[in-house]
Amino acid sequence: MAERANLVFHNKEIDGTGMKRLISRLIDHFGMGYTSHILDQLKTLGFHQATTTSISLGIEDLLTIPSKGWLVQDAEQQSFLLEKHYYYGAVHAVEKLRQSVEIWYATSEYLKQEMNSNFRITDPSNPVYLMSFSGARGNASQVHQLVGMRGLMSDPQGQMIDLPIQSNLREGLSLTEYIISCYGARKGVVDTAVRTADAGYLTRRLVEVVQHIIVRRRDCGTIRGISVSPQNGMTEKLFVQTLIGRVLADDIYIGSRCIAARNQDIGIGLVNRFITAFRAQPFRAQPIYIRTPFTCRSTSWICQLCYGRSPTHSDLVELGEAVGIIAGQSIGEPGTQLTLRTFHTGGVFTGGTADLVRSPSNGKIKFNENLVHPTRTRHGQPAFLCYIDLHVTIQSQDILYSVNIPSKSLILVQNDQYVKSEQVIAEIRAGTSTLHFKERVQKHIYSESDGEMHWSTDVYHAPEYQYGNLRRLPKTSHLWILSVSMCRSSIASFSLHKDQDQMNTYGKKDREILDYSTSDRIMSNGHWNFIYPSIFQDNSDLLAKKRRNRFVIPLQYHQEQEKELISCFGISIEIPLMGVLRRNTIFAYFDDPRYRKDKKGSGIVKFRYRTLEEEYRTRAEDSEEEYETLEDEYRTREDEYEYETLEESKYGILEDEYEYETLEDEYGSPENEYGNPENEYRTLEKDSEEEYGSPESKYRTQEDEYGTIEEDSEDEYGSPGESAEEKYGTLEEDSEEDSEDEYESPEEDSILKKEGLIEHRGTKEFSLKYQKEVDRFFFILQELHILPRSSSLKILDNSIIGVDTQLTKNTRSRLGGLVRVKRKKSHTELKIFSGDIHFPEEADKILGGCLIPPERQKKDSKESKKRKNWVYVQRKKILKSKEKYFVSVRPTVAYEMDEGRNLATLFPQDLLQEENNLQIRLVNFISHENSKLTQRIYHTNSQFVRTCLVVNWEQEEKEKAGASLVEVRANDLIRDFLRIELVKSTISYTRKRYDRTSAGPIPHNRLDRANINSFYSKAKIESLSQHPEAIGTLLNRNKEYHSLMILSASNCSRIGLFKNSKHPNAIKEWNPRIPIREIFGPLGAIVASISHFSSSYYLLTHNKILLKKYLFVDNLKQTFQVLQELKYSLIDENKRISNFDSNIMLDPFLLNCHFVHHDSWEETLAIIHLGQFICENVCLFKSHIKKSGQIFIVNMNSFVIRAAKPYLATTGATVNGHYGEILYKGDRLVTFIYEKSRSSDITQGLPKVEQIFEARSIDSLSPNLERRIEDWNERIPRILGVPWGFLIGAELTIAQSRISLVNKIQKVYRSQGVQIHNRHIEIIIRQVTSKVRVSEDGMSNVFSPGELIGLLRAERAGRALDESIYYRAILLGITRASLNTQSFISEASFQETARVLAKAALRGRIDWLKGLKENVVLGGIIPVGTGFQKFVHRSPQDKNLYFEIKKKNLFASEMRDFLFLHTELVSSDSDVTNNFYET
């Protein structure tokens, strides 16, 4: 009793580790038997307590954490911000992944801490808490997944899945989370089974390799050892673990006193003495040399001293112990156990977080900026790296705090920034090298959309290898994928494309372009337009060779009302032959799909076209030449399209008026046609003075082929136009439609039943009254059939038929009326004119081609009723007799039309010529769309209204406008754009090709106004002219590209710079903007919407792509923070940053300063320039930028961005592809190589252990090691000679690889908290590395080249023979090592039985049955077993050799030091391992 009273009473809980310690203490003190007795008592006690407590576990014991909701929300917010940064191109994919992992990891860890405290406070006796935290079952991580959050998963390859599982198992997972969980955590029964099988197979292979290793003798007499020293950063715990149970290889001295002798085994007492000695004199202490299985000299077994103490008791291992099998099982068994651990923890990612420095209080932070340099954190955020220790002061209101930041830390705040209390100001980089936990991983980034690849100037254009497409990035830069949609076109239409064709497509991307498909083609010298073939007809002469320098710019138009994707009309801008626009020239066509006739009625269009009064003549021969060449052009392409060529040119030039007339065929062009009148005209006089204030003018109609149609386009257009002084010309096109289509004429009900004669007096009167300001379009019904020549007609020419008469075998008429048949070369045209026929009495008094208005009463008819419709009177001759005329009265439909609109200042002039502003007027006219004359007809539509832009200007004197295509080049970037200028002098603009032609003087220091209607050309960036010199045009540039680029309107967004800028130089009167809505440009981009532009010039930098910093003028005294903390400042060419006075504007060309009045700027203006890439949401002006992209059109009050997706790529990343290459969605863009923390999960660990054992390790060697081996090869053979050099070289390699392999394997197990003694691993590694391969270069009589032999055997053979044997170290995997043993029976029982036995038989191998397995197979007695002491006689030769070495003291100690030196040399490599067993 008294004894018990003196005992110390410990009242504390005991967990797993405490129990382990207790048992090991008991064994040390009392031995095995007594310990097992005590443990039995413990077991009984435990069961008794557990039964009485009767802990049960129910689902309501799983208490969830209340704070989880907002923690998860916070993390989600952070990762959402991260997504946005990635989208803007601010961080790259790896940084995004890394940061998102850390965000969720930190959240998960924090939740884990919350969980512990939550349990402790709310329910300390909770069974889950008791169970997991006592170590009885489960651990904190598993409970965390039950009640906290499952967190991040890693997939079977060990890569992170960056979508975390936010739920816990108590709440239940959503479907997505469940799938990720199954995939990542590998929870299936199958998987556990497979893992267990893997672990079992690993155990089997390990045992197979080492089953024959037995402790056979006491001492092998080796003089080698491995040094262990705590100096190299080895932890004390590890140091103790390494030393205990080992045998010393050398005496240990402290000072002159020997404290331990060679061959003494190390116990706990000795280790403590070592540690105290090291602590007392850390630098003078010598390393401790110990013996390991690696140094044992025996080939097929191991000696007692090299193995050390037995793992079970504190004495040397007994002779006859099968240490090999023990080793194999010790390593394999934890694997089997650990596979089951995947049940909950499997796949959950764990990482580490850095130490943070936080601010002590609110205040302004200051540090010396010269001591830091800017860098980028691993999350892609800007930071400063300090080289040396940095003092940071934080100035609060009354106190000055000083914080010391260690070197190599990251400072996360700017100088002079205001920081809040507890804000993170720096991150301390961990001092220890975490190399071992990292692995290099490739991550591929794939393109998210089709596009064209661009990169900034930081990427080398030359690929790494000559023909490859891989490029290394020298520094961090952006890659941009400019949005583009690809158009794969059929072969026929592909021949039409030239370089820099610009097209519009909508609809499906991969649809082939049919002949009338929905895409405009615009070419640099031949221009094609397939959306509405009518444009093609009117511009067809652009194909002529003569018109080489015409250019067409179609402007896109987007209609919200219609259900089509985008219906667009092109505005085709033409520049005439000489580059001079006369007044009233049509230079643009405007095609509006809304005026298509939906119900396919046929008919003739008749319209009037008014022009200004001035008259222009041009040489008639010009026109004739054009048409001749045209004819050739068309005939060449007859296989694809059939055209009717121009039969004859008809022009009328009269004295004070001129007319536009089109030709009888389908392809008349109304633009600039002048010629001699060849027709007979009847004129109808009209008095127009009161309306126009102009002298009397006439308008004429051409006989016999026309009707007229009037169209009301006011409400369609939405804005009435003002009419200017105009006259009339006529323009006519035949309407040809295919007879196979069924047409219903919507106007059939409007045919008047009974009409009286129209007297000529009436016609003269009424024609004067309806000439209002609104022009009229008339649509006259007629039916047209185009029949093959061979078809037999059932009706006669000039006969009158009723509705639904049979015309040919299978066509019937839909209208009744007069039939006219016209036979042409390839086909027959059959026209049916509806209406009544009248035979007038006096033929001379009837005028053909009159329109009778509806209100007009017929003079000689008895009834006087109002007519509802206009009718059209047409005079016909009958059979060419002069007396007989008849008149057909045909019902027409009238449309009113909105007259031309004024597009003043579409092209503003330079400021000096501001008064000469060019007026562009809009005029609508009718054209008719024709089908192809082949059997396949894609669509036939009547096109009602075309709009023309007419150049006219207000001055009295007759001006000409110089229109030219301006080419501006800066640093080999060439841009073409249209420039229209009023020039007094007529300069011939047609020079030789590639000539720098003058386009009129550009005033000094003014921006070139030409960039207003610029259109984008591929791979060229527009820039402005740099010097006040003449700028010429470079036309007809031919380059071949392999593929077409189409930019649709959806890829572009427009940003307005100014809402309402007032400027002293601006034009005083503004014309209201014409609502042609936003007109989209050639690539679907908005080119200058037709409206006013202010004439001020803006800050534009030229030819400099700023990706990071944007400059802007700040005039409202507000600070717009553009990107990060860049306050208003300018950067000049030398990259100096100067603060900016808001009154100074920088002229980018001559760097002069202009002083601008303060009130002239109303909004902040960013300096933008063409080709600049802008990221989304950059605050350049009041409206944020909605999309990332490249600016490719800069207008006076807006600019257009081509949508682009930025990707950030860091140094060392590899770019796939070439600059400007077209990429498709899913193509590989960039390959990042980055280091990532290895997932420290045993389920990744086990395969890794297996990889190492199978010698499939992927880690590269340390560069230091290579250098050392080189030094070794230089010096050592000189000292020792070649044989020794080979021996020691192989030794060195093997020793090095052995040590690192042991460390790698230990690291995996230790990470799981599994303690395996190094000796077990060493025994197996010794077998894996004990072979060398005989190399080919030395001919040897003993071994054939390529043969695998044991290292010791090779050494002995080399010593025995005089000749040297050349061999190199080789690392076998455990499977190959099992198949390369000395016993073929053992090999055959492992794998490939037949092959192994057959080979052994052929070679006559002898099996000496030394191992366990072969004896088991053959049923013999196994040669192991402890408990017998057998004395082994040393052979006298061996003994003599040993003593001989002993006697040669000098050589022995030198040699021993040398061998120790080389192991130490290798092991002290700090990059690989500080010593052999460091983790």
From Swiss-Prot:
Keywords: Chloroplast, DNA-directed RNA polymerase, Metal-binding, Nucleotidyltransferase, Plastid, Transcription, Transferase, Zinc
Protein name: DNA-directed RNA polymerase subunit beta''
Organism for this UniProt entry: Triticum aestivum (Wheat)
Cofactor annotation remark: Binds 1 Zn(2+) ion per subunit.
Stretches with biased composition (Acidic residues): 622-631, 704-717, 731-749
Classification lineage: Eukaryota, Viridiplantae, Streptophyta, Embryophyta, Tracheophyta
Keyword Glycosyltransferase recorded: no
Catalytic activity: RNA(n) + a ribonucleoside 5'-triphosphate = RNA(n+1) + diphosphate
InterPro entries: DNA-dir_RpoC2_beta_pp, RNA_pol_beta''_euk, RNA_pol_Rpb1_3_sf, RNA_pol_Rpb1_4, RNA_pol_Rpb1_5, Rpb1_funnel_sf
